[in-house]
Amino acid sequence: MKLIKPYLLTAAAVLFVSCASKKEISSLKDVYKNDFYIGTALSADQIEEKDPKVDSLIRKEFNAITAENIMKSMFVHPAKDKFDFALTDKFVAYGEKNKMFIHGHTLIWHSQLAPWMSEIKDSTAMKAFMKDHITTIVSKYKGRIDSWDVVNEALNEDGTLRQSVFLSALGERYLADAFKLAAQADPKVDLYYNDYNNEEPKKREGTLNLIKKVRAAGGKVDGVGIQAHWRLDSPSLKEIEESIAAYSALGLKVAFTELDITVLPNPWDLKGADVNQNFEGSAKMNPYPKTLPDSIQNKLAQRYADIFKLFLKHKDKISRVTFWGVHDGQSWLNDWPIKGRTNYPLLFDPKLEPKKAYNSVLQLKETKE
């Protein structure tokens, strides 16, 4: 029997441990650290670190955070003369503690409004609300929050302005006013316009026109957020790439702000994130209640790989890629457009295990290094 020298065994053991350690510390934020931020949306429970395992995963994989809900007006400004910063303070402190990029979401949005805002009937009252709301919140976190969604989802699918309490009271000037107020409150913070489906031609053109008009009126717009609530088969990579080019041509930073990919049936051809669209469910509409078949896992992994290849191609134009949730179990897509379905749109399953899609995104970088 051939004897193996002890020092060779020692060297082999060291090499094995080294390789294992290298594999163990690989994470999304580490492998993409020279390309763009990798972020996630945090729920209230995650901000308060209620689940240590989830918290550990967040800190390991992500270097940017967005508040999923707690900065929307119904939560942060629940009464005319009352702000509630209990959770927003914890959110910002969490990001600072973990040295993360902190994104504020959102200042002006037609949905999830505080009920008292129904009292606002005229332009004077609306201007007063916007000044108070934007100035108070942005000033409070001046120098601590890195970027803001100033206006969210102001457009219809054809690129025209969406009807809202803001448009009704002030006309389209509310858009420029919002960006001006945010810039006055914190001149150094990056200001974004954020929307869904704005990689599609008509809405893309509407987004470009909106930003041009805001700038012409003296508003500061630093970037555009493409929410990226996508499907396995749409939008096309061509549409995404054309959008990156069109927005960056205006000198805008491009962020993919709410990335997830639905795998469930969609006979209504719904796209994006119109939360007012809801339908009745059936077993046929919820085909994977317990587990996702390998065939669909593979399609999801390939879709994510194709998308991230495109992101890497244009990494000089992309500031951040944020997933809308940490794991499948918390995804809003489990309840939209049908409540109670089981969707699988993210990179981690409800048990916090990485999926094939996670590996496909990670390996794009690891194979090159």
What does each of the following model-derived ranges do?
Residues 17-18:
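C-terminal motif of bacterial Sec signal peptides marking the signal peptidase cleavage site
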Residues 21-64, 68:
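Boundary/entry segment of secreted carbohydrate-active catalytic domains
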Residues 29-33, 52-63, 89-101, 138-142, ...:
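Acidic (Asp/Glu)-rich catalytic clusters
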Residues 39-44, 150, 179-203, 255-258, ...:
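Aromatic-lined carbohydrate-recognition surfaces of secreted/lumenal glycan-active proteins
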Residues 41-52, 73-86, 155-160, 197-206, ...:
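Acidic-and-aromatic substrate-binding clefts and catalytic sites of carbohydrate-active enzymes
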Residues 45-61, 128-137, 203-214, 304-310:
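Short, acidic/polar
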Residues 64-78, 87-199, 265:
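Substrate-binding cleft and catalytic face of glycoside hydrolase catalytic domains
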Residues 119, 140, 149-172, 181, ...:
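Aromatic-rich peripheral "rim/lid" segments of glycoside hydrolase catalytic domains that contact
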